[in-house]
Structures are given as structure tokens and as C-alpha cells.
């Protein structure tokens, strides 16, 4: 299937600052391609430090009036954004598929609708938020106010470009902040098109979108003296740098980072549910998911029954043209990611691991121009293996046999990460006990990779700081002010 790219994507994009697309301070651009075909989609402006200065200055100016708008006004604008996203769902989903390589069935059903739902959700959250008043005694009163922080600086990863942007933008502007956000230089196009919705709905300067390299303009955003709050989704290595910038400037940071999550299949699991859940955990979005269930821990009693079913299921996955509605897995997002995946396959071949399914790049039937990889299942002898400890970020699943629930818990916790995990069991008490014992921010029971609004998402340990996607995330973008009132009109007698 082929579409006319220019029906969806402009040939060039400027920076979105103060409600307009503008030229950058430099004429440098970055080529943006379709990872499934190698086709050039567009050229984006390569922002420099001067552009970051401009965007932050505009955001600071806009904050003065935006922070004073009523909650109901902000809520209505967020709802309008969500409505317009849904009205343009098919177009924006196609842009996401063209730019990211993920299947159109996912962008149409998940990425764009869930982005829209986040704007609707945080409209309701801010509209129903209430402060508190505490009567300390008959003469004194404590009022607690939640106030916006100021200018938010955000950078989001390439795996869910529009959805992750919504996770940042919706709560930030709902709380009364303004934002300067930068998408990945490889997948910026959906957010740039959605800027046209912001242009229609929001006052100028509330949302500003820069494009460029993370090591250049992204770093400049995080180290800018005019930025009051940092928010980042990406690798743990870069997360350390963002945390250092936050510490240096003494500003708060929300970090959603890497993971090596364990998906635990107990001996009483419904195997039909488990097979589907395992695939949801590692094949959804080509495995390019921070919460991917990339370590499969299988009870020894059902190991020999489950593994052949997985081998068959993996071999039947349709990998191909992301624009085809029947495609279940599309292209990896770029050559660097494909090379990284291949490097771990090489490690498996040179070690005592056993490749049970997949393990190859796909190049037949017109796939040679893209970065397609087979669903891959690898048995490793224990959790100390390199493939069981490091985040691969692709459709590569390591499987480890466990003898009981406690061993599953111990192995699940034997990781520097703590983002997510899963448990499959028909005994809810047993599943809950494991869920409580595993040190991660999210545990799914009898499903995987469901991330709706209204349920907190974020990690323990090296997987990040803070939570997103639920009402408590609003506090990430607020400061608490206490107004303490003495109505006694009486001297205290100390001086």
C-alpha cells in the first residue's frame, strides 16, 4: 500500500514558537525518513541555543497570562484539543506510521486515541481539583493552594512520539504552565502536525515545539535558567544527565526511563491468555517499549508446554508493510536500533543461550529497504546472562525457567530497573502476593502493556522518578503554597 506523502506531511517544517512556525537561527536542517522504506519524508529545522532562548522567553511571557486563566477555561481548551485530535485521527495515525514504522492498526487504535484521551482526562482532573482549608484552631486557618510552576522543558523519545508528548503537554498546561517540548529528531512529524491544532485552540506561547538533536537543543532546554521544571522520557543513560541538570539548577524533574521487566507465567495460568499477554509484552510496537515484558519467567511445570506454543505464535506473526491493516509488526525505528538488536543476537550465538525462534533481519518481499526483524525467543540459563540484564528494546524475549513463586520474585527483582512486570495466574491471591513483592511501578495481572489514563505509570530504581498518566501526575507540574491566616488580631507577647 502506498500513499501520497504530501497529503499528510509538509516538505519542510520550521520551529513552532509563539503560535507560529518560524525559521530557526541557523539554516541547518535534519532529514526525516520512513524507516520502513528509507524514503525521505521531510526536513526539519535544527534548533540551536538561540532558538531555545527564544522559545523559553516566549513561554515565560505566555505564562504570565496563561497561569491566570480559570480552570474551566483551560479544561475546555484541553477538551477541544482532544476532540480535534480524534477528528483528525486517521491522518495523524498515518503520519505516525510513516515516520515511526509502527503498524497502522496500532497508531489508529492506540497512539492517537489514547493521546486524545489524555487531553480529555486532564481537562476533567484540573476542573475537579480542589484545594484544602485546615482550621488549626479557632483563630488560625491554613489554606493550601496548588499553583503552576512556570515553564516546563520536556524531551520525548521516538517510540511513541505523539502519545508521550500528550503525557507531558496535557498535565503541564492543565496545571497552568507553559511548555517547551522537543520530540526525537527521527520522529517529530506527528507532533509538528498537531501543532496546527494547538495553533487553533491555545493562546500563543503556551506550547512551543523545537526540533533538533537531543545532545544540542535538547540539552540546552534542560540546562536553561528560564526552565522551571524538567520532564523526560528516554534512556536511563540520558536520564542521568537530565537529573544532573535538574540538580544543578535546583528544579524538579520527572523521568520515565528504561526497563527490563519480568513477565511471570505461573503453573496455574490460563495459557491462552498467557500466550497473548507474552506477545503483547514483547511484540507490541516491535518491542520498542520501555515497559516491555522482555524477561519471561516460566514455571518449570508448564515450561515444556508453553515454549512450543510461543515458538508457533512467534512464527505466525505477520511482519511487513506498516500501512497494511493486516500487519502485526512493522519496522524498527532506525538502523541504529536494528544494529543494537543484532548485536544481542550475536551475543546469544556466542554464549550458552539458545535461540528458539527468530533471530534474523527480514529482507524478503520488499522489506530490504526497511529495518524489519523477526519476533525472537531466546532461552538463557539464568538471570545473570547479558540478555537478561540489559535493555534490548526490540522484539527479543529471553525465557528463564523457575521452580516456584519465590524464585520468580527473586529473579524479577534482580535488575537495576523497576518499571513494570506481569503475572499470569488463575489464583488472584497468588498473583497479588507476587505483584506486591516485585519492586516495580506497574504490574499487570493476566494482561500486559495496557497504559490507559487514570492509572499511574512510572518506575522504581533506575527506571525513573515520578508517575504519569493519572491525576496525581498533575502535582508533578504544580507547587504547593500555604497561606496561614491568624484571625485573632492578638499580640503573641514574644517581643
From Swiss-Prot:
GO terms for molecular function: aldehyde dehydrogenase (NAD+) activity. NAD(+) binds at residues 212-218. InterPro entries: Ald_DH/histidinol_DH, Ald_DH_C, Ald_DH_CS_CYS, Ald_DH_CS_GLU, Ald_DH_N, Aldehyde_DH_dom. The active site is at residues 256, 290. It comes from the Bacteria. Coiled coil: none annotated. Its EC number is 1.2.1.3. Belongs to the aldehyde dehydrogenase family. This is Putative aldehyde dehydrogenase AldA. It comes from Staphylococcus aureus (strain bovine RF122 / ET3-1).
